[in-house]
């Protein structure tokens, strides 16, 4: 009797194992399918974003169509549109309307920038309009004399910069830059290109600060496309990874990883000194004060000698221009009175209008950016003093009494502290 019970038990066991195996296999297949589906969806979304951000072919087509019909001209036009010796390389764009690429022009490395919309002066958190072909490169019109063009440029500078410095001298400098073929005359095509470029704060700043060490040099232009001096390292810190890998790295871990991939401390100190010197360059220069409205690591770079070079200056704007445009803006709170990420004014609750005074100066924003960058790995003998000076710097307010004196004192003290520590090191 006992023997007759065994076969049934023996038969039931494989069914149980088979059912369990099928369940495990189905679960495995389901999760495998889910991972593939989610991964494919993420890659598709990111690829779509990439193709939207990186529209170099569209930019080139628009510019070259205008050049070949004689509307615009400039030193980069022939290389871009005829000989094709100006190449677009790695895409660095962060917004579809501001195209940015590493490029090669006649075997020289550079950074190519192109606008994909009608250039507007300032944007307070709204999307810029799509590029309007009807009005692009519409000024100056045919028949405009050189003198009339100079008057147009002078009026534009007065609106942007106020009565700062010798504007007539700046106008003459612009005409020299606009004369791309250096024949002593500015053609209508060159004038149209120059006028379009002058609507861009970055181009204006490059011309004003063309002799300064930390401002990239202008290599050439065609329409509102322009080529800047190349920068070896296009971010203050971090490591460049393929975007597919970036998807799977948590933001907190990414920030920690960025801080690991930085130069040695003496080299970081030299780069930091460069940023402080750039702050000096834009603080009450010959044409007034310029405000840094997006002080982030991605906008700063450095060369192989660890000299700071600005990578993106599009959110550095003339103070006069910003004040004029923001002062009567309707607001509910201080959050409505922001340009870029860093330029903040306050909301006057009695009038529900933004005030014109920016709260935080450039130096305070630069020190905020440099705090973690410099304190990590700082030599123990200066760490306490460095931390103290950085926090004093961050606390600077535009409205403080004797702000300019404090600004100069803090800036000079910081530079002196850093220089003394790195003057005799090989790394610097």
Swiss-Prot record:
Highest rank taxon of the organism: Eukaryota
Post-translational modification: Among the many cysteines in the lumenal domain, most are probably involved in disulfide bonds.
Record topology, Cytoplasmic segments: 1-27
Membrane topology term: Single-pass type II membrane protein
Family per record: Belongs to the DIPK family.
Annotated source species: Homo sapiens (Human)
Recorded name of the encoding gene: DIPK1A
Lumenal side stretches: 49-428
The protein, known as: Divergent protein kinase domain 1A
Database matches in SMART domains: PIP49_N (SM01299)
InterPro entries, A to Z: FAM69_kinase_dom (IPR022049), FAM69_N (IPR029244)
């Amino acid at each position: 009797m006992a023997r007759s019970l065994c076969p049934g038990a023996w038969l039931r066991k494989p069914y149980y194992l088979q059912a369990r195996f099928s369940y495990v296999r189905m679960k495995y297949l389901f999760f495998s399918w889910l991972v593939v589906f989610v991964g494919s969806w993420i890659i598709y979304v990111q690829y779509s974003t990439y193709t939207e951000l990186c529209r170099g072919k569209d930019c080139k087509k628009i510019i070259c169509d205008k050049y070949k019909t004689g509307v615009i001209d400039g030193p980069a036009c022939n290389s871009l549109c005829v000989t094709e010796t100006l190449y677009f390389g790695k895409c660095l764009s962060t917004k579809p309307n501001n195209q940015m690429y590493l490029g090669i022009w006649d075997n020289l490395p550079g950074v190519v920038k192109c606008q994909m919309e009608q250039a507007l002066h300032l944007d307070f958190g709204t999307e810029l309009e799509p590029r309007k072909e009807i009005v692009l490169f519409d000024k100056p019109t045919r028949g405009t004399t050189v003198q009339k063009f100079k008057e147009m440029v002078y009026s534009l500078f007065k609106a942007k910069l106020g009565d700062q410095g010798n504007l007539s001298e700046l106008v003459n400098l612009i005409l020299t830059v606009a004369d791309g073929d250096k024949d002593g005359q500015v053609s209508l095509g060159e004038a149209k290109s120059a006028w379009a470029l002058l609507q861009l704060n970055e181009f204006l700043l490059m011309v004003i600060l063309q002799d300064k060490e930390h401002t990239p040099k202008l290599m050439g232009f065609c329409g509102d496309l322009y080529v800047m001096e190349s920068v070896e390292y296009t971010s203050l810190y971090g490591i460049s990874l393929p975007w597919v890998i970036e998807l799977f790295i948590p933001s907190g871990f990414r920030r920690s990883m960025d801080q690991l991939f930085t130069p040695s401390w003496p080299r970081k100190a030299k780069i930091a000194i460069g940023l402080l010197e750039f702050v000096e360059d834009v603080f009450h220069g010959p044409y007034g004060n310029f405000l840094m409205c997006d002080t982030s690591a991605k906008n700063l770079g450095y060369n192989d000698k660890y000299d700071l070079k600005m990578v993106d200056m599009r959110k550095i704007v003339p103070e006069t221009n910003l004040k004029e445009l923001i002062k009567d803006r309707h607001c509910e709170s201080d959050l409505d009175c922001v340009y870029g990420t860093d330029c903040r004014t306050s909301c006057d609750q009695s009038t529900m209008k933004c005030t014109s005074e920016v709260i935080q100066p450039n130096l305070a924003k630069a020190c905020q950016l440099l705090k973690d960058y410099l304190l990590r790995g700082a030599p123990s003998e200066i760490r306490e003093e460095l931390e103290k000076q950085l926090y004093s710097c961050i606390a600077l307010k535009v409205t403080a009494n004797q702000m300019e004196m404090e600004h100069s004192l803090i800036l000079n003290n910081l530079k002196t502290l850093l220089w003394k520590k790195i003057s005799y090191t090989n790394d610097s």
